[in-house]
Amino acid sequence: MKTAYQHTKKGQSCFLRAGLLMLLVLFCSVSGWAAKQESIKKKEINKSFNVGKNDILQVDNRYGNITVTHWSKSEVSIRVVIEAKARNDEKAQAIIDRVNIRMEKMGNTVSAVTSLRSQNGNGGSNESFTINYYVNMPSELTCDLTQKYGNIIMPENNKGKCDLHVKYGNLNGGNFTGPLSIDVQYGNMDISDVDNATLDLAYCGKSSIRNGSQLNIDSKYSNLSLGNVRKMNTEAKYGDIHIDRLDNGYMELKYGNCKIDELKQGITVDELSYSTLTIKDLASNFDKVNVDARYGNLNIYIDVNASFRVVANNMKYGNCKV
């Protein structure tokens, strides 16, 4: 009986090994079959245009990135790379065929626009595509760039006028010595130094400018970090602002907080509603701090050598402590 029992166990062991081997072979076969289901198709479009100092570049793209680099040529070169992924070559090619890129020069405007033809049926869950623009242009050229569902990446030094629009993506750039207009929604922004900039921010988790000479800011549901700012005009709602150093400013702040580490000259706050403004270091030779606060808090740390007068008019539901 003992020998028969051992023989039966060996038979079961062999059977289990054979079964596991069959499952392993089947798994490898299925994995190999599944891996073959992804097909990748690419298409590249290249065009170049001669430009002068008064020309304008306009790019309107979606589902990808716009990456700009500068060169010394009086020419704009645009390379568009379209990449589609699908279960088979036919479906990947169908995605490529949906994408239309129109590039032309009319008058003094070079334009490149992405459009998508309507899709036949519903796309599969494992289908995707990207449309990436790579632009070479003179640094002094005026540009108007719009990117939806993707990012705009600008070079280190930008000398021309720039209008930059990003929705559902991020904006990254270096220094801007020409007029700059920025519109970012549902994304982040990181800029180095600017001379004159207008910012329209909405639902931006993190936005930053290292240094600014003149800033005009409209911010909603966004957080903004600024370095050294000479002059700023700001309207902010539902978000926080941090400024390292400010010379002079005007502000309306609602349902948010603003912290200024160092204020050199003065600030006028026409409305401080359900918000807190904190000035950590007010220069001893400051000019004026004028704040209209309604259900808000104002905290100012003043140099011990400063000479000043406090005027608190029409105070309700609050205290003034010096």
Task: Mark where each language-model region is.
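Acidic (Asp/Glu) and glycine-rich low-complexity loops/linkers
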Residues: 2-5, 14, 32-61, 65-147, ...
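N-terminal Sec-pathway targeting helices
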Residues: 11-18
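Bacterial N-terminal signal peptides
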Residues: 18-29
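Short, solvent-exposed loop/turn segments at secondary-structure boundaries
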Residues: 124-126, 281-283, 302
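Beta-strand-rich extracellular passenger or scaffold domains
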Residues: 142, 152-154, 276-279, 298-300
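Eukaryotic tandem repeat interaction scaffolds
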Residues: 222-298
